[in-house]
């Protein structure tokens, strides 16, 4: 078991310390709150990642026609240069 780089012995020590500090009555309440916090952080992280992915897809769609036009104009320019060089 390895959660966030913390193994089973470390988790055990953390749980024992939490039990001693907060007591057995508050521990379930703290666990629920920690779970809710982690869930909301994960949700926010997923939403942020989805927004980044969506922007990247939109940029790819916008970039595709430009890159095609750019490649075509580069090829035309290169053909002009090649024909000028062959004429000289």
UniProtKB/Swiss-Prot annotation:
The keyword Ribonucleoprotein does not apply. The chain crosses the membrane at residues 3-23. Disulfide bonds: none annotated. Residues 67-76 have a biased composition (Polar residues). One of its GO terms (cellular component) is TAT protein transport complex. Keywords: Cell inner membrane, Cell membrane, Membrane, Protein transport, Translocation, Transmembrane, Transmembrane helix, Transport. GO terms for molecular function: protein transmembrane transporter activity. Residues 56-88 are annotated as: Disordered. Signal peptide: none annotated. InterPro entries: TatA/B/E, TatA/E. The keyword Lyase does not apply. It is a single-pass membrane protein. Residues 56-66, 77-88 have a biased composition (Basic and acidic residues). GO terms for biological process: protein transport by the Tat complex. It is found in: Cell inner membrane. Part of the twin-arginine translocation (Tat) system that transports large folded proteins containing a characteristic twin-arginine motif in their signal peptide across membranes. TatA could form the protein-conducting channel of the Tat system. Forms a complex with TatC. Belongs to the TatA/E family. This is Sec-independent protein translocase protein TatA. It comes from Prochlorococcus marinus (strain MIT 9301).
